Regions:
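Short, thiol/selenol-centered motifs that function as redox-active sites or metal-ligating centers
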Residues: 62, 84-93, 131
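Short small-residue beta-strand/loop micro-motif enriched in glycine and branched aliphatics
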Residues: 76-81, 91
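Short, small-residue alpha-helix embedded
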Residues: 91-101
Length: 152
């Protein structure tokens, strides 16, 4: 697993460093093309300094940690972004969470499930299904924070 041979992107090197310790290789068939795409080119990644609300969630078992940022207009999520510390599945799940939530009402976004995220990614390995929980939990925490700071 020499990193010198595998330099298609910085993201790939990060994966090799983070998941290699767990004996995982993204390109061995463990992940489908959609998961790889959302890992290599995450949608809506980054902070949002002028966010209306933010919510976080961490998984103490694996160490993954996600923060989601929301901009809301008339109860609709107009902008959403994220920062995540985690494996490829956590990054891909976080990215897909933002794709699914953007443009939805708060109520619709709150109803997004772990299964919906995993299905939208085309599936996750059984031992990585918990990664979709990060998105659901952080999104619900962000929505709760928004409602507290913007009472109806």
């Amino acid at each position: 697993m020499a990193r010198e041979r595998l330099k298609p992107s910085v993201a790939h090197d990060i994966l090799r460093l983070s998941d290699a310790e767990k004996g995982e290789n993204m390109f061995d068939g463990t992940y489908n093309d959609t998961v790889i795409d959302h890992f290599m080119s995450p949608r809506n990644a980054g902070t949002m300094p002028d966010a209306d609300a933010e919510g976080s969630f961490g998984d103490s078992d694996c160490g993954d940690y996600l923060t989601l940022y929301l901009k809301v207009t008339n109860s609709v999520i107009r902008e959403i972004s994220f920062l995540v510390f985690g494996c490829a599945a956590a990054i891909a799940s976080s990215s897909m969470t933002t794709v699914l939530a953007k443009g939805r009402t708060l109520e619709e976004a709150e109803a997004i499930t772990e299964k919906e995220i995993a299905d939208a990614l085309g599936g996750l390995p059984e031992h990585k299904l918990h990664c979709s929980m990060l998105g659901v939990s952080a999104l619900r925490n962000a929505i709760e924070a928004y409602r507290k700071s913007h009472p109806a």
